[in-house]
Amino acid sequence: MPIKIDKKLPAVDILSSENIFVMDDDRADHQDIRPLNILVLNLMPQKMVTETQILRHLANTPLQLTIDFLYMSSHQSKTTRAEHMETFYKTFDEVKNRYFDGLIITGAPVEHLPFEAVDYWEEFQRVIEWSKTHVFSTLHICWGAQAGLYARYGVDKHQMTRKLSGVYSQLADSSNLLFRGFDDEFYAPHSRHTEVLKEDIVNLTNLEILSYGEDMGLSVLASRDLREVYSFGHMEYDRDTLSKEYFRDLKAGKNPHIPENYFKNDDVHTTPALCWSSAAALFFSNWVNYAVYQETPFDWESPENDVSFFAYL
């Protein structure tokens, strides 16, 4: 089913070339259904790349979605044109009086900093607090997951001895709706310098560990009501994203190790196999369907007609 986005967004041409169904406002407004409203807080430096990655998976869901992009006004992007941000993104002040069915918070390359040292940390905390009463389910990704846990529960991240980079096998709790239809094991890319330890969250009875791997530790956590989902990997990554990160770091003189389980025979000149796309599509689809669509109020403007939402607050 289609996603409803601005037809001028650069991702539209890419998605259309992949036979992914996108529609503009005029066509969507003539359909007599309520689309789900999804807000994406894009903290990644390459905004347009991340937009396409996220939208590609959201478009695989069987529901019509209206997507808005959010940026932190307390931070100035150095890698994306101001014109793009002004055209396609909203500030928190512009959305804070609205309700959203879902919120996606991406990763960010700020792991080396304490959370409080991130220049948009105070604004990020306001978004998290606002989401408790204005968003039905929030999907946190990588640093977004670590930051969400810290903002909500005070759980800190830990520095790893070396960067975790590669495609890793992890176990899935297929009894949970987020992993319905999954095999016992699935693969996903991970790319991070820090981690959240299992022992730091086992006493948080509101959270469940849904996916774990021997080589990369925690992969996915969620609250029991699925209003909070924390994914420490990057299921949204393209085939070549880890490759681009590797060569970027190599050029910068960081002496990176070759991403694990990625290049055939660790030959960096080969094309990496794409072995996580179907699992990623199913994960995003399950989140939209089971965590958002099946539970969110139909009429946000008249919440008294649907008290199920407020039972969670």
UniProtKB/Swiss-Prot annotation:
It comes from the Bacteria. Gene3D superfamilies: 3.40.50.880. One of its GO terms (molecular function) is homoserine O-succinyltransferase activity. This is Homoserine O-acetyltransferase. Keywords: Acyltransferase, Amino-acid biosynthesis, Cytoplasm, Methionine biosynthesis, Transferase. NCBIfam families: metA (TIGR01001). The active site is at C142 (acyl-thioester intermediate), H234 (proton acceptor), E236. Belongs to the MetA family. Transfers an acetyl group from acetyl-CoA to L-homoserine, forming acetyl-L-homoserine. GO terms for biological process: L-methionine biosynthetic process from homoserine via O-succinyl-L-homoserine and cystathionine. Pathway: Amino-acid biosynthesis; L-methionine biosynthesis via de novo pathway; O-acetyl-L-homoserine from L-homoserine: step 1/1. The keyword Metal-binding does not apply. It is found in: Cytoplasm. It is an enzyme of class 2 (transferase). The record marks E111 as: Important for acyl-CoA specificity. It holds the Pfam family HTS. The keyword rRNA-binding does not apply. The record marks S191 as: Important for substrate specificity. The gene is metAA. Substrate binds at K163, S191, R248. It catalyses: L-homoserine + acetyl-CoA = O-acetyl-L-homoserine + CoA. Its EC number is 2.3.1.31. One of its GO terms (cellular component) is cytoplasm.
